[in-house]
């Protein structure tokens, strides 16, 4: 459970100034973090475990339901063999080792497929680093694969996971990739290359090389998120970036020399997009070393399947249902729904193409669809006499199947919705919050206003005890039917205190309907 700020322990940090070789600084930092560790706070480790368990629930569910991208990538991985001298990686639900980079791609794709695992909007107000780049806790399979290869125990593996989250989280605070049409997973690829190379024993030169290769050769663009209907490439973006990050790390460890000092390279993406004097990168980078001085405390949980920038609107509906109990039972009486949101959310989940989704990937990034489906779920709950809250309204895979996407009731509700840009007052509150308001004009109840919602449940600044309860419930619902015993699975994948042997086989549990390899 994320602890309140008052219960966190202070911790030291390391600053990598803009006028230094930050790629080499990251390499030094990664080696020190793993091989000369300072104690990490209990709050940080507990939060990290929860994000990892949450990601496993998402991945298991996607595979059990036959989601296309992770199934294709898992099949590809299971057809591969580890390199000579390698222990290989383990795919979710299989026991036979596979090529490391392919196993990582398969597992990361499964984790990300539902778009329901942890998220961040790079923001550290206390340090004035508020670039607000997106990111997700997609890259834990990189840590698991590196741990299996290096023979790490559970506590050491947690440090590799934390290292990945820290590097990508801090990069998200200082460099907004989206402004340059670059996909947010690139920060995760940089973090994965550094952490993987360090965990496998790479020296500073090898780690710097791996980082340089990822930046010079493998930059993903947001083309995967444009167009009327989104494809498998959207959900698999992190997986494919993790795959090349691991390949870059292993290639560098084998002696390949990639570009050095990549953050100050005038033709690399950083200075190319943000021109600055020779000898400088566009940003300072400060990274946690111990205590609870880590970016993970600014990361958020999703309480179901939805693009996280819609969470403010979902919280607004929950609040309105509590305030006006009759609303949930009568969505037909809604004459108009007006939602005011901020940029960049307005351009991402409210563009005109999102009003008529036909694929799951488009529906879970469509604010109109998410709200319409929630209104229909609320009506079903109201028929039982209950007031719909987050528990009852949790969006799950069935809410995005073909039948529900094509439901005429969805289209009818979307036709009464208007999503507007809330303007500077809303924009200024992001990325600290998810500023949203919902106003409903109802035939029986008149004008209903949610007021401004900034920190919905699941947000790092929301009620953490309530969030924890719902995240646990989400895990149970996602893996129900996919494994024999959800509680046993939750216990199995917690890493603290686990042996080297436990870690090596952590994901080798049966999943109903999956090829055991």
Predicted regions and their residues:
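Terminal-appendage/accessory-domain detector
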Residues: 2-132, 233-243, 250-517
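Residue-level detector of well-ordered alpha-helical segments, enriched
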Residues: 47-51, 138, 156, 160, ...
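Conserved, well-structured ligand/cofactor-binding cores
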Residues: 49-50, 127-140, 149-158, 183, ...
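Glycine-rich, mobile lid/loop segments that gate access to catalytic sites or pores
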Residues: 147-243, 247, 261, 266
């Amino acid at each position: 459970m994320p602890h309140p700020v008052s219960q966190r322990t202070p911790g030291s940090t390391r600053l990598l100034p803009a006028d230094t070789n930050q790629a080499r600084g990251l390499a030094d930092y990664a080696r020190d973090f793993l091989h000369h560790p300072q104690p990490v706070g209990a709050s940080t480790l507990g939060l990290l475990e929860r994000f990892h368990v949450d990601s496993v629930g998402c991945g298991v569910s996607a595979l059990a339901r036959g989601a296309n991208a992770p199934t294709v990538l898992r099949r590809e991985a299971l057809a591969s063999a580890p390199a000579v001298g390698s222990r290989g990686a383990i795919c979710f639900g299989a026991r036979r080792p596979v090529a490391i980079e392919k196993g990582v791609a398969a597992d990361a794709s499964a984790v990300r497929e539902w778009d329901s695992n942890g998220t961040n909007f790079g923001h550290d107000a206390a340090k004035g680093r508020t670039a607000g780049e997106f990111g997700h806790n997609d890259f834990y399979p990189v840590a698991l694969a590196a741990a299996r290869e290096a023979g790490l125990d559970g506590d050491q593996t947690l440090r590799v996971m934390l290292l990945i989250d820290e590097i990508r989280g801090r990069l998200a605070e200082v460099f907004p990739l989206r402004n340059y049409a670059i996909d947010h997973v690139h920060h995760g690829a940089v973090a994965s290359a550094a952490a993987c190379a360090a965990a496998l024993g790479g020296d500073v030169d090898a780690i710097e090389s791996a980082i340089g290769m990822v930046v010079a050769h493998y930059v993903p663009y947001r083309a995967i998120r444009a167009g009327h209907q989104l494809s498998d490439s959207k959900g698999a973006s992190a997986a494919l970036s993790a795959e090349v990050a691991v390949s870059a790390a292993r290639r560098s460890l084998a002696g390949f020399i990639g570009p050095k000092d990549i953050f100050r390279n005038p033709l690399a993406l950083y200075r190319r997009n943000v021109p600055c004097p020779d000898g400088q990168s566009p940003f300072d980078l400060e990274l946690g070393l111990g205590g609870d001085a880590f970016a993970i405390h600014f990361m958020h949980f999703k309480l179901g399947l939805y693009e996280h920038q819609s969470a403010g609107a979902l919280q607004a509906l929950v609040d309105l249902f509590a305030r006006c109990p009759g609303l949930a039972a009568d969505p037909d009486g809604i004459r108009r729904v007006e939602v005011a949101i901020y940029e960049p959310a307005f351009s991402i989940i409210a563009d005109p193409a999102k009003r008529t989704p036909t694929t799951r990937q488009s529906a879970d990034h469509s604010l109109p669809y998410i709200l319409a489906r929630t209104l229909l779920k609320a009506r079903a709950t109201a028929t039982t006499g209950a007031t719909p809250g987050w528990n009852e309204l949790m969006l799950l895979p069935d809410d995005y199947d073909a039948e529900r996407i094509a439901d005429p009731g969805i289209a009818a509700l979307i036709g009464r919705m208007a999503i507007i840009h809330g303007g500077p007052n809303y924009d200024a509150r992001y990325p600290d919050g998810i500023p949203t308001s919902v106003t409903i004009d109802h035939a029986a109840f008149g004008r209903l206003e949610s007021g401004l919602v900034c920190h919905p449940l699941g947000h790092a600044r929301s009620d953490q005890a309530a969030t924890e309860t719902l995240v646990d419930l989400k895990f149970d619902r996602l893996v129900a039917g996919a494994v024999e015993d959800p509680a046993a699975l939750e216990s199995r994948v917690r890493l603290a205190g686990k042996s080297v042997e436990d870690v090596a086989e952590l994901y080798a549990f049966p999943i109903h309907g999956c090829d055991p390899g």
